[in-house]
Amino acid sequence: VSAIWLSGAHAFCPVPSGLTPVAVQRVVDGDTLRLSDGRSVRMIGLNTPEMGKQGRSDEPFAVAARKRLEALVAASDGRVGLLPGKESKDHYGRTLAHVYGADGSNLEAQMLAEGLGFQVAVAPNVDLVGCQQAAERSARQAGLGLWRQSPVLKAEQISTSGFAVLSGRVSKVQRNRGGVWIELQDSVVLRVAPNLLGQFDVAQLEKLKGRQIEARGWVVDRSRRGGLKSGQARWLLPLTDPSMLQMTP
C-alpha cells in the first residue's frame, strides 16, 4: 500500500529542489512541528482539528492527525525538508513552511489525502494550492477521515468563532471601501479585504447573489468587539484566497 500511496503523494505535490534539512524535536499537533533548533513550524496549506486546551475537549480527528504526523516524521528518521513560504513567519512567530519527508513526499498533501486536515490558503503562501486541493479532493470523494461524516456546516449553524467549512446561499453582495462583502442568509458575511481584491475575480463575486456556495476560513464573532451595527451579520469570515470559496451545484 505504501508504495502505491507514495507515488500518489508525489503526483499531488512534486518534490522541489533546494530543501533545507532539519531535525524534528517533537510533533505539537497535526500541522505544527517543534524543531531541535527551537523553532516552531506551521505547515503551509494544512489546517488540522484542534487539540483540546484550557479544559476543552479535542476536536474529532485531532489526536489521529497528530499521531499520523508523528508516524510520518518517524518514517523520515526524524528529519524533514523545509521549503519556507514567501511570508516566512506568522503572527505567533512560527516559521511558515512546506514540509517534505526523506522520500520527497509533501507531508501536507499526505495528511490532506488521508482526510486528516483541511486545505487552507493564506496569501502570499499559495504556491501549492492546486496540488493540495487535489489531495483533499481525493480524501473527500473517498469519504476518508474527517470527510466520513460531512464536516460542512450550514451558515445558520455557525455558533462559535474559529475554523469552519460552511455552505449557504448568497443573499447579498456589496462592494465598498472595506472590500467585497458576501452575505449568506443574514447569518454570516464573507469579506474580501481591499488588499486582496487583485487575487479574486471581482466581477464573478458580484454575480454570486442567489448562488449556493461553500466557504472556509477562520470565523470571527463581531459582537465581541462591540462593533456590531443593527442589521449586520454577527459572524464574519475573511476570505484569504480564491480557493477558500467554491460554487456548489
Regions flagged by a language model, labelled:
Residues 2-249:
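Small beta-barrel nucleic-acid-binding modules, primarily SNase/OB-fold domains
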